[in-house]
Amino acid sequence: MITLKEALNKSENELKEIKTLLRQRVKENIELNAYIGEINESGSGVPILIKDNINVKGWEITCASKILKGYVSPYNASVITKLHENKMCAFGRANMDEFAMGSTTESSCYGRVKNPLDTSRVPGGSSGGSAAAVAAGLAIASLGSDTGGSIRQPAGFCGCVGLKPSYGRVSRYGLIAYSSSLDQIGPITQNVEDAALLLDAISGYDKQDSTSANLPSLNTFKDLDPNARYKVAILKDFLKDATPQIQEAYNHTIKILESMGHTIVEKSMLDTRYHISAYYIICTAEASSNLARFDGIRYGTRSESKNLKDVYLNTRSAYFGEEVKRRILLGSFVLSSGYYDAYYLKAQQVRKKICADYESIFNECDSILLPIAPSVAPKFGSTHSSLEMYLSDIYTIGVNLAGLPALCMPVSKDKNGLSIGMQFIGAKFKEQNILNIAYGLEKEINN
C-alpha cells in the first residue's frame, strides 16, 4: 500500500483511484471484518480510516455497541477538522471493541476482527480494526484511541506503528469518552515517518477541549533525525511476566540500540501489578460515569417499557455488551460511599506514585524501552477470563496513567511469522525523542 508520505504528493484524481482500490480491497478481505458497513468519505484528500468512537458529521457512530445503533453524528471531532485542513479526509469506519473496552476486538456488536498475519488470532484491541486494516493494506493510515494501550497493542500484534501522544497533545473533542483522564486519539501507520506526519496534522491546542495543552504546533516530521542518540532506560524486572520469545526480542532490541550508539541505563519501577490495579479502578470509575448518558432517552436504541425506571433498566441490560456491563458495575462499586476511600482514593495515590517513578527516570533518561505485551497475539478463545485479558495490558497502562507519549513499532517476528512489537516511552510532550529513536531503529532493522 502507498504510504501517507507518498499519498500527500498525489493529485486528487490519483487519490480517487486509490480510494476505489481501497474499496475493492476491503470487499476482497471482508473476512477480516476491519471495516464497519458502507465506506463513506468526508471530502477530498488522502483517505484516513476512522475508529468508530470518533465523530464525523453525518456518519453513524456506534462505538461498536447496539445501544448506539442508528445514531448519526451532528458534528465533526476536532481531529477530523484538522485532517481536512491538512489535505486528508475521513474514509470508512474501523471496527473496535465495544466502547473501546477490550484488548482483543472481540466484543464488537459487528463481530470480531481477525489478525491479517494469522486469522486464527486476535488483532489486539480496542483499535483492532484500525490496526488490522493498515497491516492488511486496506488503509493508508488510521486514527485510533488509546486508553490503556488500545493503539499500541493492536499495532504491535499486527505489525504496524502505533503512536499514543501525550495527554493533552491531541484534542479529545468529538471522541466518545471511555475514561476521560486516560483517553487519547493517535495514529496507526505503516512506518514511523507516517506516524509523525499524522501526529503533526491532528495535534494542537483546541479551546473546545479543556484538557488540551496550549503548546506550539508540532513539526515532528520535518525534525525527524535518525542519527540523534539518547539515553534509553530498560526495565528488566518487568520482563518476568513475558514469554521467552518476548524477552529474547527485548534483549536483541537493546543490543541493536547499543550498537547504534544509544546509551542503555537499567532502571526499576513500581511493580506492574500496582499499575493494573490502579488502572482498572480509575478507568472503570470514569466509565461508569461517562456511560450513564446512554440510557435510551436522548439518543441511540431504546427498549419500550411501561415506566421510566424500566426504560433505563431494560435498555442498558439489552443493548450493552457483557464486558461493558462488567466495567460499569465495577466502576459503580468503587465509587460507592462505602468503598470510595478503600479503592478509588488509593488508586489515585498509586497513580501519583507511578507518575513520580516515571519522572524520576526521565530526570536521567530520554526514553524507556518496554515490550508492548507479554506475548505475541493470542489465538481466539485462548483467553479464559476477563482478568487474563486485563493482564495483557501490563506494559501499556502505566503510560496512560502518567499521560506520557509512547510509540510501538515492530522489531521482529516469531517462528510463526507473528509480529513482536516494542514501545518507546517518552517524557511528557517529548514525542520528538521517541519518534527519532524509533525512526533510527526502523532504518537499522530494515537495512
From Swiss-Prot:
Pfam families: Amidase (PF01425). GO terms for cellular component: glutamyl-tRNA(Gln) amidotransferase complex. Keywords: ATP-binding, Ligase, Nucleotide-binding, Protein biosynthesis. GO terms for biological process: translation. It comes from the Bacteria. The keyword Nucleotide-binding applies. The active site is at residues 51, 126, 150. Allows the formation of correctly charged Gln-tRNA(Gln) through the transamidation of misacylated Glu-tRNA(Gln) in organisms which lack glutaminyl-tRNA synthetase. The reaction takes place in the presence of glutamine and ATP through an activated gamma-phospho-Glu-tRNA(Gln). This is Glutamyl-tRNA(Gln) amidotransferase subunit A. It comes from Helicobacter hepaticus (strain ATCC 51449 / 3B1). The gene is gatA.
